Amino acid sequence: MITRIWHGYTTLENADAYENLLKTEVFPSIEKKNVKGYRKISLLKRVMESEVEFITIMLFDDIQSVKQFVGEDYEQSYVPARAREILSHYDDRAQHYEIISEINY
């Protein structure tokens, strides 16, 4: 299993709008791609003094599944145009990690 981790940042004022955009447009559009091996996406949020950090963690079966999602240059970020309008800055590249162990309690 592969995790794909990406960071994006908004102003304090734009945080709610960005969160709503992710939940109502971006995440559903990813699901509609029907990427084989795409398992789930998690959204994390951290409010800081002058901005809000959002982290997405996507779970895929393998790197081939990630490539089906974003192309051969699989580390490129996936940031739709509407999201770019709201974000103040974001990672140009996503990080990918192989899950080597997982413990559930």
Per-range role (PLM):
Residues T3-Y9, S42-Y74:
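Short, well-ordered beta-strand segments in beta-rich or mixed alpha/beta enzyme
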Residues M1-I5, N14-L21, I55-L59, D92:
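A broad, low-specificity signal for short, low-complexity segments enriched in glycine/proline
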Residues L12, F60-D62, E98-S101:
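Non-catalytic surface loops within mature trypsin-like serine protease
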Residues R39-V52, Y78-Y105:
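Glycine-rich beta-strand-turn "strand-cap" elements at beta-sheet edges
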Residues P28, K32, E72, S88-H89:
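A structural signal for alpha-helix termini and helix-coil/disorder junctions
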Residues N14-K40, Y78-R82:
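Short amphipathic alpha-helical segments
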Residues A15-A17, S65-K67, I103:
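Intrinsically disordered, low-complexity acidic/polar segments
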